[in-house]
A protein has these predicted regions:
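Alpha-helical segments flanking ligand/cofactor-binding loops in enzyme cores
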Residues: 41, 63, 130, 134, ...
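Active-site microenvironment of metallo-dependent hydrolases
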Residues: 275-373
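Alpha-helical scaffold segments that flank or form the walls of functional sites
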Residues: 4-70, 93-109, 355-365, 369
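Active-site gating loops and adjacent loop-to-helix segments of metal-dependent hydrolytic enzymes
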Residues: 2-33, 71-94, 150-178, 198-201, ...
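His/Asp/Glu-enriched, well-ordered alpha-helical/loop segment
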Residues: 171-178, 220-306, 320-323
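Metal-coordinating catalytic core of metallo-dependent amide/deamination hydrolases
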Residues: 60-190
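Divalent metal-coordination and catalytic microenvironments
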Residues: 3, 47, 65, 116, ...
């Protein structure tokens, strides 16, 4: 959240290695708590009722989620490079995962779910894949991973192993549990068949993929193969906002532009990716994703009485092609109002903003010794 607008107009590798990772090294739990509170506020403002997040200092993230009332699937991002000594029981990130699962998994009747994670094939090694896959299976956890986001990443894996990232991870049982694979921009047709067989959900992030020039995911191909495809924003650092309505429209337009078919990914299908398919990917199909008797009252209201939404010949069309998160007037989770008309009844926005300006931003962006303490 702190890195919104810090590094734009770059490819993924330059963006990560030269800008994002170095600043993330300066984060601490206090900074992440303030940033997470504001990120949740932004998500609620734009009508998101449930999120998935892979990051660091997840105990503080869970605290913010618990206070806010939003639903969340949280995973501690895991990376490990060759040469690192590895033992699951002593590896710091794995110990954090265990503590996180013991403390927060299924908190508040499942409003918070803890998941395992592998940042990506190219930022980790087989020892980590094996250990996390085993832990996820034994503890009934889902798993998050970034998969084939760029052509460079995908091709390097094929050159190294003779297999695609999806095939390599499958060899190490990573897909033995429900997995959400972010991006899937360069997965092959064979990958799609494999991922569908393993019930892997793809989190399509069209705005981030376009902004980083990573490519255009073959959403129609994945759906045709039988994959569940939902939507994500990736992050404010690569997007640069959390407005899921932008993703809905971008996904529909990208599919049409990629195929040359104006009927590709029609409005209803694009909207389902943000609702039904998202709930399915999070393992929440029994509680949300549709408005139906017996489901949680996870609802949003939009103000259609505005010049850019008049006249309304087709509600679905407006939701996909004309509306934005700024049109959301109310966001409710489990029947509790979390955002309404500019107010956040469960969040201390002023306090979080003060923390961000007084502590988090100086810590991450000041080059003095206090920033690295």
């Amino acid at each position: 959240y702190l890195l919104r607008g810090y590094a734009d107009d770059l490819n993924l590798q330059d963006w990560l290695e030269h800008y994002i990772f170095p600043r993330e090294d300066r984060l601490d739990g206090r900074a992440v708590k303030a940033a997470s509170t504001l990120a949740i506020a932004e998500a609620l403002r734009f009508g998101t009722t449930s999120v998935s997040d892979m990051y660091y200092f997840c105990d503080e993230i869970c605290q913010a989620v618990a206070e806010s009332g939003i639903k969340a699937n949280i995973s501690r991002g895991m990376s490990m490079f060759l040469g690192d000594d590895f033992c699951f029981d002593t590896f710091p990130a794995c110990r954090e995962l265990v503590e996180l699962k013991d403390k927060w998994h299924n908190h508040d009747n499942g409003r918070i779910k803890i998941e395992a994670s592998i940042h990506a094939e190219y930022t980790s090694t087989y020892q980590l894949w094996d250990a996390l896959a085993e832990y996820a299976v034994n503890n009934g956890l889902q798993l998050q991973v970034h998969l084939s986001e760029t052509k460079k990443e995908h091709d390097a894996c094929v050159e190294k192993y003779g297999l695609t990232p999806a095939q390599v991870l499958d060899c190490h049982r990573v897909f033995d549990v429900p997995v959400v694979a972010a991006h899937c921009v360069h997965v092959t047709q064979e990958d799609m068949q494999l991922l569908a067989k393993r019930h892997v959900s793809a989190a399509h992030c069209p705005v981030s993929n376009l902004k980083l020039a990573s490519g255009c995911a073959d959403v129609l191909g994945m759906v045709k193969a039988g994959m569940n495809v939902c939507l994500g924003t990736d992050s404010v650092a690569s997007n640069n906002n959390l407005d899921l309505f932008e993703e809905i429209k971008a996904a529909a337009l990208m599919a049409k532009g990629k195929t040359g078919d104006p009927k590709a990914l029609p409005a209803e299908a694009a909207l389902m990716m943000a609702t039904v398919c998202g709930a399915r990917a999070q393992g929440r199909s029994a509680e949300c994703g549709v408005i139906e008797l017996g489901m949680d009252a996870d609802l949003i209201l939009l103000d259609f009485n505005q010049p850019h939404l008049i006249p309304c010949h087709n509600v679905l069309s407006h939701l996909v092609y004309a509306a934005s998160g700024h049109d959301v007037a109310l966001t409710m989770v489990r029947g509790k109002i979390l955002y309404a008309d500019g107010k956040y009844p469960t969040l201390d926005i002023a306090g979080a903003l003060k923390e961000l300006h007084d502590y988090a931003i100086p810590r991450v962006f000041s080059d003095g010794p206090e920033a690295q303490a």
